[in-house]
Amino acid sequence: MEWTDIFSGPAFEPVKSRELHLGKDCDLSRPLVVRDTDKLTVEVAGGAALRLVVLHTKPCQAEIRIKLLEGADAELVQLFSAEAFVDFQVEQAAGSKFRMTACQFTSANVRYRFDLNGREASNELDVLFLALEQDHCVVDLRTNHLVPDCTSRSLIKGVASGTGRGEFCGLVYVAPDAQHTDAQQQCRNILLSRTSRIDARPQLEIYADDVRRWGRWRMKRSSICVSAV
């Protein structure tokens, strides 16, 4: 039994459609599961709540688009057990909430782009990647704060062993009028061999005056720990 078979059980609702539209009266008693899609478009209406699991169990290239209307709520889990190249974009209207956990258990290349287009939108992302032996894991993240009063938090954790390689490039962009932005970004990594490597490139591009921002990266190899804030 594969661990992904858990999501074939009665606690989950399989979905084969490439397009999902959740109205405010939509009642989802079970989380939805999308497996090995190459294209997925999701729209969540205000007052609706999406719970979605996205599985990548076969090598593929995928494009995922999610649009949260005003007051919508979404919680996602994304799991990789096969190499995949994924372009993942989210657009958020005012008062919407987006939370996501992603785990790369093998080589993968994922580009995340989050656009916070409405006031008081919130965005949370947690990513774990395991670059073992000869694996190559890439996380490319851009979070765009385009209006005032939005919050974002991203935490990226990586582990590399053998000749495994990990890459993280994260940009937080704050537009000129996006006052009272609260943006947090962290990257913490562990190297288990002298031949493994993880490159972390956190970036800030801020054009507003009243911004709360916090960034940290940490790399650990054996008993040596280096950190910068």
Label every model-predicted segment.
Residues E13-A228:
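Conserved beta-strand/loop scaffold segments within soluble protein domains that form the structured core
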Residues E2-I6, A11:
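C-terminal functional modules
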